[in-house]
């Protein structure tokens, strides 16, 4: 019986639901569950609901819902059943088996699902289906639609899981893992169980008892009102702050975390608030995120909580260049000018802020939009109880101020978006582009104030603003006309200016609107509070003449204020006139007379517009004013009505498309108002991030491409298709993004084009850190991280001439098509003339080598030949009647001859070939005849720089290794007496006719690393610290691999001012316990004890090597105690798995840098991508190895390469990419799995007032690394917690300590070590000898140091340093894990429920399970390989003996024959 239970647990077998019928739930209870994201899945066609049974899932009547029908989307795209306490799983080895519930961390079934347009989709494109009328299965054959029972929208996707970020604990702020197992129970939400203080907490891995990673959760009961125990209150301002200094999140993650706690990222409104924050974090050497950001591409810097930005304390190093990627703000309390900008993807601690008397920022003060009829003097414009006058004489700011004062007015102050709208209209009517406004600063730090003394309650900064001019005592502000945005301007410049003064307010009766209607501009508005369907509301009867249409952000803000006055329900909605009238997915305005009008502005909520065929309503709250698609027939809402102030006949105006042709080589088609240009990697210097690409387009006066309607998307798709090989996965940035934190998570176009269709599938809902979209040539958009680098497409209005940037090198209008460029000459000439012209342009007359190329050429010459013409191609007879050959020497592998034409062989003249623009067929003609022709080139004109010239292969001496065009010697002598310092290594290489190696690519780095397998001795390479940007051979450093990545020149911290600096030289690490494998770091050049790598140029003088005779890669390879098998066949990922199994292997898993490097070299030689065993079922959020291996090692191409599909391949540089599993690749890599060792350290950590992380048999607290304490104070703190200061006893422990504090980023510099340095030796204060030390570049000489020195560890360099014992720095506590401790809960508060009998029973059970597991393990080792987990990802390093690679796979036949 015990054996059966254990096997079921290990297999992750289907969970059995509780015996007996589950209690029925009332409709009210079901609706309550829905508020928590828990729903019932109903078949749309069969009207029955999915219920978890004892062994299978079935369809049952929905009339008596019970807990076994309740589902919830949880972490990793899992679907969790509340009653069955298990996750929906698909057995991939037998997909036809009915679906069941499994342990939620099972590795033997697929647990990941996606909801997409009423379908639930798993791996292999299997969707949830119904079999035999009520059995739930997964199949790829049919499509079954599912809806949410008793839900207004019926959308099963609306409750998709959103990460819940933790605070405190020991997880550095990482999100909760739901469900997580604690005390033998799966929790799908935060719990108070085990907490004496009743706080909500969660685990951040699936099993708390195994990993002990946890943190506190936001408390929903206190998020809305007040400041509970997790906030610190400023009694003077009644503002609360939350200091998350142990967390390490990206900006967007920190933004989400603050919102979940009912607050927002920190905004700083004045110097007093900044001083308060500085005082609170004064003891922490930490840089933190604030809410400052520049993520709205159409605006400037802003606070994420909407607070006006009028106080500034920028660091002098801040850059306002458009190409700089730092768009998120930080605060550093240790600096007087404390504000900096950072890359938003960096991970940092953060501070949240919450107002006690908080009012929703989007509920605008209604009075700002209320219409007041106002009377003014002649020449002054009335608006909202004030009078305004644009003075059309240019003056400096101070002159303008005094001029207004002289007319009893002031320079205009602007307090709302309503007033911005008025100013834009005023400037537009007067044809003025810019004006002074009354905002200025005369202080430092900068604090902008209105000249009339009114408070700054609103700001509207322009892109890259406010820019601060150094050494300026006064800063002044102007406003531009197009959007009313502000910018900081030199006060001595001259501009028009606007004066403002109070007017005479008239009665409400003079507004021009009927009673009950509100006026804005030339229209009157009213809310019909009766709930109606869209068809009734839009009929014109209840809302004459029509529902509201919204033209711009100003009208939207007015509508929002109007709604706020009547909203008293949580879920109130208001119909507007927007509808997908033709069910095409494109939304248009439905106006009076049932006519359609195009959309000029949109204001969608997150994940909207979700579907086609719907009608649009405005949300009344949370967030107010946002648009959502609703069912036109069944959904009921109030109505927003709109009518003109004066009845006037609407002018029917014909919309005229501009007919101006596109300038230069921009492209369009008839009927489109814009021109497009594709910037792909063949034509530009580099791929770029989204913001860099947008700035690149702006240099031309353009923006990243948008799609105003389906015709534009179709054109862009047609533009891409012929350019690139269809097997290529090309991705291009377009303007679609949701970067702006004030935009409620909705997507928008960077050029302001309205979003009139649903461009993203429901697949991507909930993934809120991929904020920018790329376009793929299969008409799909894919969200990616904005910091990843891609190609891009720009768009510009057809009648706007593109600007020519100074760096742009214009090329003739060559057309790119699949790795070649073509220049079409429609003017006729003889064949030899074109041979000369094409040659002069470094090209050849056209060659055609495929049907695709033929199709491309024919399409172009048809368009260029109005009446039909023949065009020369590059086939020519060498002599009369000779065989035709391509002039560029390439073989004739494709032909398309006209077989009807007579081919006489009696011609006296030399003939050349042509192609007909009518038929596309080829024929011959005398070369002297005049025809148009086409040039073709393979070497591209790069608009930013030209390419390098090719090199030649040669031979290498015996014992040296071939790599690319180099010979490499990897020398790690077995005898330590032959190890060398850097100078000796350099001289040795010189004597051999070479130099120390210059590593110039990732593949070369991998080649060297793979040849160091089994070594623990690092090797010298050709760099020195006095010129680390140039290799010893004189080449610039184009590739680098420093450890850590942002540190190049590490100083010697144990060197005093009296000692001369040590010259430093670069080593490549093959000892992962001190530096990560393959990484570079600096060491004392004179220190002996290292190997080295030499390089020299291959000898091409004797005879050139034909690389085609290099040894082919064998199908079976041995490396590093592993056996690999290479499968060469065109196959999908699934076929690759089966093929590996047929060869007695598994699709490869890669767990360390050595084996990754080996495979990188192999893939580089093979020349094409291969499948590996990594896959995902949740759009790239989490990945698993198909052989069950657990490893944290990754090698992605970039941060977004994991989001492109469900299955993974390695490219020819070894980097990993995900793609569609059904894609065909030319091969796969298999391996014969090795046995893994069982988990060896089951002990638990005791509970104290600080959190602990376990490694092997010790526990560590990293919560104190940001504290500042002397050595003695730190020692006493740890002692009170029943622990000691940190000691480092072996290499594995040192490796663990290198990795774990990386989560704190640059915030952690040094921590104390529990040791003393006496008589040139280190002694641990716990009495154990210090066998392990790491002084780095130089061991300290005590003669040069003051007394009372203590030992510290520098993070992240990992070296030891002497520091005065009284110095304040961070520290880490360490204690032994205790198997006798029974953990009742994480965090604060010791457990007092330890019962000796329970301890004894626990030991007996553990021993029984270990004995039984060992027995089963012996019976089936292959099965247990799949069960190996990663409870602790740090294992003792195996001391491999040096592996002698008898024949390196890159040695050529020539060397073998020497």
Swiss-Prot record:
N-terminal signal peptide: 1-23
Substitution effect: residue 1436 to A: Does not affect receptor internalization
Annotated ranges, domain Ricin B-type lectin: 49-113
Domain Fibronectin type-II: 171-219
Cytoplasmic side: 1417-1458
Positions of the C-type lectin domain: 227-356, 374-502, 511-645, 660-798, 815-939, 954-1098, 1117-1231, 1243-1376
Tissue specificity annotation: Lung, skeletal muscle, brain, kidney and heart.
InterPro entries: C-type_lectin-like, C-type_lectin-like/link_sf, C-type_lectin/snaclec_domain, C-type_lectin_CS, CTDL_fold, FN_type2_dom, FN_type2_sf, Ricin_B-like_lectins
Primary role: Receptor for secretory phospholipase A2 (sPLA2). Also able to bind to snake PA2-like toxins. Although its precise function remains unclear, binding of sPLA2 to its receptor participates in both positive and negative regulation of sPLA2 functions as well as clearance of sPLA2. Binding of sPLA2-IB/PLA2G1B induces various effects depending on the cell type, such as activation of the mitogen-activated protein kinase (MAPK) cascade to induce cell proliferation, the production of lipid mediators, selective release of arachidonic acid in bone marrow-derived mast cells.
Transmembrane parts of this sequence: 1394-1416
Domains as described in the record: C-type lectin domains 3-5 mediate the interaction with phospholipase PLA2G1B. The endocytosis signal probably mediates endocytosis via clathrin-coated pits.
Species of provenance: Oryctolagus cuniculus (Rabbit)
Protein name: Secretory phospholipase A2 receptor
CC per GO annotation: extracellular region; plasma membrane
Domain of life: Eukaryota
Biological process (GO), any one: positive regulation of arachidonate secretion
Extracellular side: 24-1393
Any single Pfam family the record assigns to this protein: fn2
Positions bearing carbohydrate: 91, 408, 431, 452
Location relative to the cell: Cell membrane
Gene: PLA2R1
Single GO MF annotation: signaling receptor activity
Cysteine pairs bridged by disulfides in the record: 49-62, 87-104, 176-202, 190-217, 258-352, 328-344, 404-499, 476-491, 615-632, 697-794, 772-786, 838-935, 912-927, 1065-1085, 1207-1221, 1278-1373, 1350-1365
PTM annotation: The secretory phospholipase A2 receptor form may be produced by the action of metalloproteinases. It contains all extracellular domains and only lacks transmembrane and cytosolic regions. It is however unclear whether this form is produced by proteolytic cleavage as suggested by some experiments, or by alternative splicing.
């Amino acid at each position: 019986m015990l054996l059966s239970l254990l096997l079921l647990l290990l297999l992750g077998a289907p969970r059995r639901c509780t015996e007996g019928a589950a209690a029925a739930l009332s409709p009210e209870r079901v609706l309550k569950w829905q508020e928590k994201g828990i729903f019932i899945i109903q078949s749309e066609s069969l009207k029955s609901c999915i219920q978890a049974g004892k062994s299978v899932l079935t369809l049952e009547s929905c009339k008596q819902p019970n807990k076994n029908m309740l589902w919830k989307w949880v972490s990793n795209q899992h679907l969790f059943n509340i009653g069955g306490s298990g996750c929906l799983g698909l057995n991939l080895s037998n997909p036809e088996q009915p679906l069941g519930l499994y342990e939620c961390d099972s590795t033997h079934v697929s647990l990941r699902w996606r909801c997409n347009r009423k379908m639930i989709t798993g791996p292999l494109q299997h969707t949830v289906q119904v079999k035999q009328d009520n059995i739930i299965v997964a199949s790829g054959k049919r499509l079954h639609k599912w809806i949410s029972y008793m839900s207004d929208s019926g959308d099963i996707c609306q409750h998709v899981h959103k990460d819940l970020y933790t605070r405190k604990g020991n997880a550095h702020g990482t999100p909760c893992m739901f469900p997580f197992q604690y005390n033998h129970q799966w929790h799908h939400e935060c719990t108070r169980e085990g907490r004496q203080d009743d706080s909500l907490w969660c685990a951040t891995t699936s099993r708390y008892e195994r990993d002990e990673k946890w943190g506190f959760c936001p408390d929903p009961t206190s998020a809305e009102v007040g400041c509970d125990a997790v906030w610190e209150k400023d009694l003077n301002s009644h503002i609360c702050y939350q200091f998350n200094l142990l967390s390490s999140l990206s900006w967007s993650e920190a933004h989400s975390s603050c919102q979940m706690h009912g607050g927002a990222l920190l905004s700083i409104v004045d110097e007093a608030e900044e001083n308060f924050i500085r005082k609170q974090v004064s003891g922490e050497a930490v840089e933190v995120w604030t809410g400052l950001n520049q993520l709205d591409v159409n605006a400037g810097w802003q606070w994420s909580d909407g607070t006006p930005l009028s106080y500034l304390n920028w660091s002098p190093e801040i850059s306002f260049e458009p190409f700089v990627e730092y768009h998120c703000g930080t605060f550093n309390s240790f600096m007087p000018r404390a504000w900096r900008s950072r890359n938003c993807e960096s991970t940092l601690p953060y501070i949240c802020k919450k107002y006690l008397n908080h009012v929703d920022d989007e509920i605008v003060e209604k009075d700002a939009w209320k219409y007041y009829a106002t009377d003014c003097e002649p020449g002054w414009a009335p608006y909202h109880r004030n009078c305004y006058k644009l003075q059309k004489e240019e003056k400096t700011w101070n002159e303008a101020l005094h001029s207004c004062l002289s007319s009893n007015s002031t320079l205009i102050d602007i307090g709302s978006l309503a007033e911005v709208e008025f100013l834009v209209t005023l400037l537009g009517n007067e044809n003025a582009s810019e004006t002074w406004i009354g905002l200025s600063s005369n202080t430092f730090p900068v604090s902008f104030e209105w000249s009339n003394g009114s408070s700054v309650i609103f700001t509207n900064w322009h892109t890259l603003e406010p820019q601060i001019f150094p050494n300026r005592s006064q800063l002044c502000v102007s406003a531009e006309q197009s959007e009313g945005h502000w910018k900081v301007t030199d006060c001595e410049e001259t501009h028009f200016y606007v004066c403002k003064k109070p007017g005479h307010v008239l009665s409400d009766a003079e507004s021009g609107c009927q009673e009950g209607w509100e006026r804005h501009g030339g229209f009157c508005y009213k809310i019909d509070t009766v709930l109606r369907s869209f068809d009734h509301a839009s009929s014109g009867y209840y809302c004459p003449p029509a529902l509201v249409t919204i033209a711009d952000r100003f009208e939207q803000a007015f509508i929002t204020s109007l709604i706020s006055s009547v909203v008293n329900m949580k879920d109130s909605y208001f119909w507007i006139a927007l509808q997908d009238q033709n069910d095409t997915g494109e939304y248009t305005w439905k106006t009076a007379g049932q006519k359609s009008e195009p959309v000029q502005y949109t204001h969608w909520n997150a994940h909207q517009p979700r579907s086609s065929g719907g009608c649009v309503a405005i949300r009344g709250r949370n967030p107010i004013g946002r648009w959502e698609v609703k069912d036109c027939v069944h959904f009921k809402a109030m109505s927003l009505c709109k009518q003109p102030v004066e009845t006037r006949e609407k002018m029917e105006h014909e919309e005229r498309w501009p007919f101006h042709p596109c300038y230069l080589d921009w492209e369009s088609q008839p009927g489109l108002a814009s021109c497009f240009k594709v910037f792909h990697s063949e034509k530009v210097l580099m791929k770029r991030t989204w913001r860099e690409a947008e700035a690149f387009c702006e240099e031309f006066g353009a923006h990243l491409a948008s799609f105003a309607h389906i015709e534009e998307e179709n054109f862009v798709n047609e533009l891409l298709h012929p350019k690139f090989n269809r097997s290529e996965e090309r991705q291009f940035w377009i303007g679609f993004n949701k970067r702006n934190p004030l935009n409620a998570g909705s997507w928008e176009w960077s050029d302001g084009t309205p979003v009139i269709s649903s461009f993203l599938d429901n697949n991507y809902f909930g993934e809120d850190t991929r904020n920018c979209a790329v376009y793929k040539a299969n008409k799909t958009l894919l969200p990616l991280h904005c910091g990843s680098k891609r190609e891009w497409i720009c768009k510009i209005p057809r009648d706007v001439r593109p600007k020519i940037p100074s760096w742009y090198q214009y090329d003739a209008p060559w057309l790119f098509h699949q790795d070649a460029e073509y220049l079409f000459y429609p003017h006729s000439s003889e064949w030899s003339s074109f041979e000369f012209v094409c040659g002069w342009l470094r090209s050849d007359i056209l060659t055609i080598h495929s049907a695709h190329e033929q199709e491309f050429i024919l399409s172009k010459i048809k368009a260029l030949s109005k009446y039909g013409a023949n065009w020369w191609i590059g086939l020519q007879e060498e002599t009369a009647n000779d065989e035709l050959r391509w002039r560029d020497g390439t073989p004739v592998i494709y032909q398309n001859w006209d077989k009807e034409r007579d081919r006489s062989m009696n011609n006296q003249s030399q003939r050349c070939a042509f192609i007909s623009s009518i038929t596309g067929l080829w024929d011959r003609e005398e070369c002297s005849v005049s025809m148009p022709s086409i040039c073709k080139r393979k070497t591209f004109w790069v608009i930013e720089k030209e390419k390098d010239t090719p090199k030649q292969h040669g031979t290498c001496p015996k014992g040296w290794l071939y790599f690319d065009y180099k010979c490499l010697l990897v020398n790690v002598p077995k005898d330590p007496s032959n190890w060398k310092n850097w100078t000796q290594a350099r001289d040795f290489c010189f004597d051999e006719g070479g130099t120390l190696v210059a590593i110039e690519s990732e593949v070369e780095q991998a080649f060297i690393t793979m040849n160091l397998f089994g070594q623990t001795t690092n090797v010298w390479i050709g760099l020195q610290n006095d010129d680390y940007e140039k290799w010893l051979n004189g080449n610039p450093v184009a590739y680098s691999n420093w450890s850590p990545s942002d540190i190049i020149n590490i100083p010697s911290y144990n060197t005093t001012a009296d000692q001369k600096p040590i010259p430093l030289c670069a080593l490549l690490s093959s000892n992962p316990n001190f530096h990560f494998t393959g990484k570079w770091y600096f060491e004392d050049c004179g220190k002996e004890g290292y190997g080295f790598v030499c390089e020299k140029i291959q000898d091409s003088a004797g005879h050139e090597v034909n690389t085609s005779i290099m040894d082919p890669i064998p199908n079976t390879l041995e490396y590093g105690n592993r056996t690999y098998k290479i499968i060469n066949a065109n196959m999908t990922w699934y076929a690759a798995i089966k093929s590996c199994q047929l060869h007695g292997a598994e699709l490869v898993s890669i767990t360390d840098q050595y084996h990754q490097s080996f495979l990188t070299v192999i893939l580089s030689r093979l020349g094409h991508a291969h499948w590996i065993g990594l896959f995902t079922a949740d759009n790239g959020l989490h990945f698993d190895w198909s052989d069950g291996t657990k490893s944290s090692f990754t090698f992605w191409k970039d941060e977004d390469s994991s989001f492109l599909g469900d299955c993974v391949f390695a490219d020819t540089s070894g980097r990993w990419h995900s793609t569609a599993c059904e894609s065909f690749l030319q091969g796969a890599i298999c391996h014969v799995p090795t046995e893994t060792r069982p988990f060896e350290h089951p002990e638990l950590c005791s509970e104290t007032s600080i959190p602990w992380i376990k490694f092997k048999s010790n526990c560590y607290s990293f919560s104190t690394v940001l504290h500042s304490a002397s050595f003695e104070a730190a020692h006493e703190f740890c002692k009170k917690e029943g622990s000691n200061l940190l000691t480092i006893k072996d290499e594995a422990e040192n490796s663990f300590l290198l990795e774990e504090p990386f989560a704190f980023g640059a915030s952690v510099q040094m921590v104390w070590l529990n040791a003393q340095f006496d008589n040139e030796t280190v002694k641990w204060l716990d009495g154990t000898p210090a066998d392990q030390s790491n002084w780095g570049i130089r061991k300290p000489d005590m003669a040069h140091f003051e007394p009372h020195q203590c030992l510290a560890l520098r993070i992240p360099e990992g070296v030891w340093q002497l520091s005065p014992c009284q110095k304040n720095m961070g520290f880490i506590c360490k204690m032994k894990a205790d198997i006798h401790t029974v953990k009742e809960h994480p965090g604060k508060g010791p457990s007092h429920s330890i019962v000796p009998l329970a301890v004894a029973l626990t030991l007996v059970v553990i021993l029984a399970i270990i004995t039984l597991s060992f027995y089963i393990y012996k019976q089936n080792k292959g099965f247990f390989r799949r069960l190996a987990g990663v409870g602790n990802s740090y294992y003792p390093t195996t001391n491999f003996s040096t592996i002698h690679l008898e024949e390196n796979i890159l040695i050529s036949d020539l060397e073998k024959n020497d």
